[in-house]
């Protein structure tokens, strides 16, 4: 792995132990690492009660915003619960495009209803031009006579979908 002294900050995907996403997020934050765990709230029901519970949108994964430097990567890897960085080439962590992280944050901050969506590479790339999701980029697809914006995280081969009005989007 090549390391540079003046490396800029990039987002990387980290694989974590099963059901340890929130604990690892807390540990990374306490270590001074900028970490992002896309999560959604779902209503869980038991026999005697109902409660809103936060669930990771991509179970087993979270994102870290670090420099591609030995010290930063080692700090992340030494964090209890972290398994490895996701990479296409062994030993070479694959950066996640800033646009994909920002689009996820825009959708999640606006409390839109999201559904996990299978990974898609082909399709029309669009940007939402107005409304609460303005600025989010993704793929426009049609499902059951409704238009959906699909935000894909390429490195994970996963994505999410959110309902949009087709008139609110423009092609890139």
Predicted features by range, described:
Residues 131-134:
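Short, charged beta-turn/beta-strand-edge "cap" motif at the junction between a beta-strand
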Residues 136-141:
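Short beta-strand-centered aromatic/proline hotspots
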Residues 1-127, 145, 150-151, 155-172:
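Acidic-enriched and Gly/Ser
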């Amino acid at each position: 792995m090549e390391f540079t002294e003046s490396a800029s900050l990039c987002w990387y995907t980290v694989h974590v132990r099963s059901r340890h996403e929130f604990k690892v997020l807390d540990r990374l934050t306490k270590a001074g690492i900028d970490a992002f765990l896309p999560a959604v709230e779902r209503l869980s029901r038991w026999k005697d009660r109902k409660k809103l519970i936060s669930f990771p949108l991509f179970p087993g994964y979270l994102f870290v915003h670090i420099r591609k430097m030995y010290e930063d990567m080692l700090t992340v890897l030494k964090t209890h619960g972290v398994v490895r960085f996701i990479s296409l080439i062994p030993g070479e962590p694959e950066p996640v495009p800033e646009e994909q992280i920002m689009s996820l944050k825009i959708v999640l901050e606006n409390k839109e209803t999201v559904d996990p969506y299978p990974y898609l590479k082909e399709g029309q790339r669009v940007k939402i031009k107005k409304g609460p999701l303005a600025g989010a980029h993704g793929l426009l697809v049609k499902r059951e006579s409704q238009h959906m914006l699909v935000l894909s995280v390429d490195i994970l081969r996963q994505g999410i979908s959110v309902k949009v009005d087709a008139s609110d989007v423009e092609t890139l």
